[in-house]
């Protein structure tokens, strides 16, 4: 059976992430994954209090990649990342990480509510009541697929086509691109 663990990296566990990878290796785990706090729901406050800045994130990912390589493990990075801010997943060997909401994945809740991603705060329709085309072409979905929530600072950046501006729920991106309003407004 293949098992993949996922660790949300925070100030509380960043220093021990490589140790966690070693511990998991000792249990026979071959695949580990990690992400950052997502700016949705309680994650907004948590990211302010416990989120890693770009320098710390790059350091912990670099160390984690090195540890996983030494142990012959696969490390996956799930968070869409703004490369210009200092953490380039391609440079770390983690591949292109861009927002895949409404493009490669959507979330359908038990009542049929459709979200562009599992963390998106607002519905784009209901799979039990709405035509798929109205959900797929919902203005929020179209903006997400076009990476139109990215900040002005991202436009013309050398990484623009690779990262797409990172996660549109990221508070810094949302604030820059939406004048402080929520990403879906």
Task: Please tell me what each predicted stretch does.
Residues 1-119, 123-124:
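Radical SAM enzyme [4Fe-4S]-AdoMet core and its adjacent flexible, acidic
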Residues 89-90, 96, 114, 119-185:
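Flexible mid-to-C-terminal extensions adjoining Fe-S/redox cofactors in radical SAM and related proteins
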């Amino acid at each position: 059976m293949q098992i993949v663990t996922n660790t949300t990296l925070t100030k509380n566990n960043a220093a021990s992430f490589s140790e966690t990878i070693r511990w998991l290796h000792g249990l026979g785990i071959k695949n580990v994954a990690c992400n950052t706090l997502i700016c949705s729901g309680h994650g907004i406050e948590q990211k302010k209090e416990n989120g890693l800045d770009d320098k710390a994130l790059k350091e912990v990912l670099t160390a984690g990649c090195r540890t996983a390589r030494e142990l012959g493990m696969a490390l996956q990075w799930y968070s869409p990342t703004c490369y210009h801010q200092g953490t380039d997943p391609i440079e770390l060997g983690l591949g292109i990480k861009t927002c895949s909401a409404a493009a490669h994945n959507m979330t359908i809740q038990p009542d049929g509510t459709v979200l562009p991603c599992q963390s998106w705060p607002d519905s784009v329709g209901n799979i039990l009541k709405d035509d798929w085309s109205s959900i797929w072409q919902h203005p929020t979905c179209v903006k997400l697929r076009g990476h139109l929530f990215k900040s002005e600072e991202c436009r013309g950046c050398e990484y623009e086509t690779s990262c797409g501006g990172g996660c549109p729920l990221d508070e810094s991106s949302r604030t820059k691109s939406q004048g402080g309003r929520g990403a879906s407004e």
